[in-house]
């Protein structure tokens, strides 16, 4: 999976970049044929934002977290995208189970 970590209008530490790469690595097994993962950090109106984008299997998942610091914003975005991925995984499992019986 291609991984991009970008900071717009701000500087981020190497530790935060590594954390973002770890977060993307956790999600790649959940995405069917994961192609690209991106994390974009930004600062607007005094609030830090983190946006996670995952693409794979013809589906794009996007989640944004907003908080006073980038680490917490990344955690919020991680929670949001995890919910999206869990719903997709459950739907895939539900479809195959119905036709199996």
Model-derived regions: residue spans:
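N-terminal, polar/charged subdomain of small-to-medium soluble alpha/beta proteins
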Residues: 1-101
